[in-house]
Amino acid sequence: AVSASLKENSVNIQKFLEPSAGIGSFIQSFAEKGVQQVTAYEKDFLTGKILKQLYPDNTIQIKGFEEIPEKEQNSYDIIASNIPFGDTAIFDLSYSRSRDMAKVQAARSIHNYFFMKGTDMLREGGILAFITSQGVMNSPKNDPIRRALMHNNNLVSAIRLPNNLFTEYAGTEVGSDLIILQKNSDKQILTQAEEL
């Protein structure tokens, strides 16, 4: 649905990244829309091998998103994924040793890290669409992360998804949100919705 919506709105997509590919649902939907440059990261070895077989024409990296080269910063048109969540810390020295306290905090929980690192990888005007736990928007301790994200991105949409959305697929009921951001590093003010 994300890829179809972007195509319907004439969003030019040349370069797509899925930072936590899993079974490749986003890869498939964007490839079907004619996106030529598709890169995916999948940390699990077996899942990554399967992805390479399913999508031989795409760049599949069997490693964690934290290993994406710095030269890839500011280069992707679209980044979309159903990202992992939890208090798992990420080993990324550029974050844990950063002077930016939001980056330091982001390295302490995987979902916050994916948001911050994802926006680093977007070109100006690029779109990030992540399905994530409700903790990103709900948790008071994530306030510095939300502020950092809103400082450098426009909030396109934030949708609270039904708790049973993944019941049939993954056998779990978890509160999830779809958050869509557009990179805007020159942003001067927050909208009323972004201040919430």
Each language-model region and where it sits:
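Conserved nucleotide-binding/hydrolysis micro-motifs of P-loop NTPases
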Residues: F85-G86, G135-M137, L165, S185-K187
